[in-house]
Swiss-Prot record:
Keywords: Electron transport, Membrane, Photosynthesis, Thylakoid, Transmembrane, Transmembrane helix, Transport. Its main location: membrane. GO terms for molecular function: electron transporter, transferring electrons within cytochrome b6/f complex of photosystem II activity. The lineage of its organism: Bacteria, Bacillati, Cyanobacteriota, Cyanophyceae, Acaryochloridales. Component of the cytochrome b6-f complex, which mediates electron transfer between photosystem II (PSII) and photosystem I (PSI), cyclic electron flow around PSI, and state transitions. PetG is required for either the stability or assembly of the cytochrome b6-f complex. The chain crosses the membrane at residues 5-25. The gene is petG. It is a single-pass membrane protein. It is found in: Cellular thylakoid membrane. GO terms for biological process: cytochrome complex assembly; photosynthesis. InterPro entries: Cyt_6/f_cplx_su5, Cyt_6/f_cplx_su5_sf. This is Cytochrome b6-f complex subunit 5.
Amino acid sequence: MIEPLLCGIVLGLIPVTLAGLFFAAYQQYKRGSQLEL
């Protein structure tokens, strides 16, 4: 049986992690495009 607290933490961390990875990728892409120009 999965504890509600643990389930809530996991469900809360997944979107935050995805948002962090997307933001980091966007920053790297933005920085790379500026260097090329």
